[in-house]
A protein has these predicted regions:
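A detector of single, family-specific signature residues
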Residues: 1-394
Length: 394
């Protein structure tokens, strides 16, 4: 077997070739450009070896390797992706202090040259790029939600200054009327000084289920007696922040439609679990990647970073530890977002949660136990392509 280690860069990459049987570097590290000409140069150097006797490895970091990875997969080469922490740890274990691109290619070959039982890489496949698109969309959704929460917090700060009583007038925040009033007036002072007919226009909305108990007259009355201060700076911020929030909502709607298309296309059995939506199901599948890369449930639990952290020394054993929080933070976030609906809609999970609470576990700890149980079920469903049936759970 010929091992080819590729160190990825923005404008150029380095590669070397190692003979796995002898451990000899048969082609010293050399660079090639990150373009078609450079890719052809790489193929020219390795096409003398049968494809089934070649294993190519590269670090799974950033995005600079995507074009090369897809190019090699389309040519039906076997490509292994390696966690950068693995190569860094391997270099340090060998006493390596110096780090450069040429030495990194050899280090990658060393990682590839591990027994099958202890392999520290995963084989990539052409269909992984379908999951890549889904992962980018679901991560973009997560990031937009975080951005929206920042804007909403800033908006609430501004409202507390110019109209502290405003939120008490509504059963829920960010409704159509709620946003219309903020966009149009921005403060209690502006509402109090505005003709009632103009205020009524903010309440004119179409569709069923959009009616609220608040009236324009009641709003104006509260604005007149408000303790809010007059601030043109806060009014400008409110108008800008409401516009940003509405823009993000439009973007999220567009993303949700595309994610639902992907979810229907995936037709995954994990959607049969009550509490898992199109978005959360797609996010879980995209973050996990190809399920064939995992041989047991504990591996995806570890990948999600929800395995309990165990610390034991010769005379010390920690009784209370947190989860590891390694791996995909997006997967971990999705799991903790959906676990409460799963517990609520599934009697087996609800019983398991109550059991952990009765054993003295805290709410967050009991959630963690349920998350790990959910991952074990997801692993089984994906491996067997079986629909969820709560009657089969123990």
């Amino acid at each position: 077997m010929k091992l080819i280690g590729i160190d990825i860069g923005k404008n150029k990459h380095f590669f070397c070739i190692m003979d796995q049987q002898t451990g000899e570097i048969i082609f010293q590290p050399v660079s090639f450009s990150n373009d078609k000409e450079g890719f052809d140069f790489l193929i020219q150097k390795i096409n003398s070896y049968p494809k089934d006797s070649v294993l190519i490895g590269m670090e799974d970091t950033g995005h600079y390797h995507f074009a090369l990875l897809k190019y090699l997969l389309n040519l039906q080469y076997t490509v292994a992706l390696i966690n950068p922490k693995t190569t860094d740890f391997n270099r340090k274990m060998q006493g390596g202090i110096t780090k450069n691109d040429k030495l990194d290619t050899i280090n990658i070959c060393d990682v590839l040259d591990t027994p099958e039982r202890k392999k520290q890489y995963r084989i990539s496949k052409v269909n992984s790029f379908d999951l890549y698109e889904q992962k980018q969309l679901t991560r973009h959704h997560h990031n937009l939600k975080e951005e929206e929460n920042v804007y909403k917090n800033r908006l609430q700060k501004c409202i507390d200054i110019v109209f502290p009583e405003f939120n008490k007038l509504f059963n829920s925040k960010y409704s159509t009327v709620y946003m219309n009033i903020l966009k149009t007036f921005g403060s209690a002072e502006n509402i109090a000084n505005t003709d009632i007919r103009t205020i009524r226009k903010c309440f004119e909305i179409e569709g069923r289920g959009n009616r609220i108990s608040l009236t324009p007259e009641r709003l104006k009355e509260c604005a007149r007696s408000s303790i809010g201060i007059s601030s043109s700076a806060e009014v400008i911020q409110i108008k800008h922040l409401t516009a940003q929030i509405e823009l993000i909502e439009e973007q999220l709607t567009e993303i949700d439609k595309k994610i639902e298309e992907f979810s229907i296309q995936n037709n995954s059995p994990i959607l049969s679990i009550p509490g898992i939506s199109h978005f959360s199901g797609t996010s879980i599948l995209a973050e996990l990647g190809d399920i064939s890369n995992y041989s047991k449930p504990s591996q995806i639990i570890k990948f999600a970073g929800v395995a309990p952290l165990h610390y034991e020394s010769s005379q010390f054993n920690a009784q209370h530890t947190s989860i590891t929080k390694k791996g995909s933070k997006y997967l971990r976030k999705t799991l903790y977002q959906i676990i409460l609906p799963v517990i609520r809609h599934n009697p087996v999970f609800n019983k398991y949660y109550q059991l952990k609470i009765s054993q003295g576990k805290g709410h967050r700890c009991a959630q963690g136990h349920c998350v790990r149980k959910l991952l074990r079920i997801i692993y089984h469903l994906l491996k067997t392509n079986q629909q969820f049936d709560h009657q089969l759970l123990r």
